[in-house]
Amino acid sequence: MQAIFNKLFNAQTLTQQESQQLFAAIIQGELSEPQLAAVLISMKLRGEQPQEIAGAAQALLANALPFPRPDYTFCDIVGTGGDGANSINISTASAFVASACQIKIAKHGNRSVSSQSGSSDLLAAFGIALDISAECARSALDEIGICFLFAPHYHLGFCHAMPVRQQLKTRTIFNILGPLINPARPPLALIGVYSPELVEPIARTLLVLGYQRAAVVHSGGMDEVALHAPTKVAEINDGEIIHYQLNAEDFGLQRHPMSALKGGSPVDNHEMLSLLLQGRGKKAHADAVAANVALLMKIHGQEDLRHNTQQALETIHSGRAYERVIALATRS
């Protein structure tokens, strides 16, 4: 381990295997707090590289509680959080809408990072249990078409890093690992990142991790597809990364200001998302969710973004997405 420390302290990049070895030791509690702090800051100052991020993700996945992975195609739609936008929870709403569009979703989520209501906070408000077994989650995925995997339930080793992360009070590699360590290991994903500088390295990381097809996005300060600014996209397809930009017009939608997506208290966010999923929400909310679902559908093989957007909007207005919420809550 000292050889790995020395490489980091000399601003050298770790191999994927070295990073995997290092993070396996971290989540097993083998590093002291000063050692862990030094490691995280050394990587942050140099800039974490794709093979290091991939190695860390592989260590966390190897040590996660197992999930019975299905043999059919399924997706994740998730963001890093931490964008500071305090928006409504678009990725969680999009997961329900995508599911109602017949796309299987195994969504990995956690408590809030920067908004007042993360995906798990919102699910709890809907009466959806967070601590169900992997077998029950798989059953929900099979029968309803959607399940949620609560990160702390699967990644118990995170607790060893938490005291240092709280003391450092700065972003580290742990802030970008969440979307990469879904224990269901989905072959397809739409991943939002909190900074445009992360789009390329996370896309390269997804290639290393073996995703079949995925898109990494950032838009005007938000970790998702947004309609107030161009969305920067790096799409993984057939082992290649394709870069492009999307605007509201590409989805057949009008632009909305970022302020139109502003969230509130957990109670407010729950009410706004409830109305949205029942087809009675604000137009800006419905359009934002439809755009994200449309891109996820493209990743799923449905290439026409405008057609996808209209299908998503019709699903939202029908209230079918809310039926998925009720079905999951009933199982809880």
From Swiss-Prot:
GO terms for cellular component: cytosol. Anthranilate 1 binds at residues 79, 110. Its cofactor is Mg(2+). Pfam families: Glycos_trans_3N, Glycos_transf_3. Its EC number is 2.4.2.18. GO terms for biological process: L-tryptophan biosynthetic process. Mg(2+) 2 binds at residues 223-224. Keywords: Amino-acid biosynthesis, Aromatic amino acid biosynthesis, Glycosyltransferase, Magnesium, Metal-binding, Transferase, Tryptophan biosynthesis. It catalyses: N-(5-phospho-beta-D-ribosyl)anthranilate + diphosphate = 5-phospho-alpha-D-ribose 1-diphosphate + anthranilate. Mg(2+) 1 binds at residues 91, 224. It is an enzyme of class 2 (transferase). The keyword Transferase applies. Binds 2 magnesium ions per monomer. InterPro entries: Anthranilate_Pribosyl_Tfrase, Glycosyl_Trfase_fam3, Glycosyl_Trfase_fam3_N_dom, Glycosyl_Trfase_fam3_N_dom_sf, Nuc_phospho_transferase. One of its GO terms (molecular function) is magnesium ion binding. Catalyzes the transfer of the phosphoribosyl group of 5-phosphorylribose-1-pyrophosphate (PRPP) to anthranilate to yield N-(5'-phosphoribosyl)-anthranilate (PRA). Homodimer. Belongs to the anthranilate phosphoribosyltransferase family. This is Anthranilate phosphoribosyltransferase. It comes from Photorhabdus laumondii subsp. laumondii (strain DSM 15139 / CIP 105565 / TT01) (Photorhabdus luminescens subsp. laumondii). The lineage of its organism: Bacteria, Pseudomonadati, Pseudomonadota, Gammaproteobacteria, Enterobacterales. The gene is trpD.
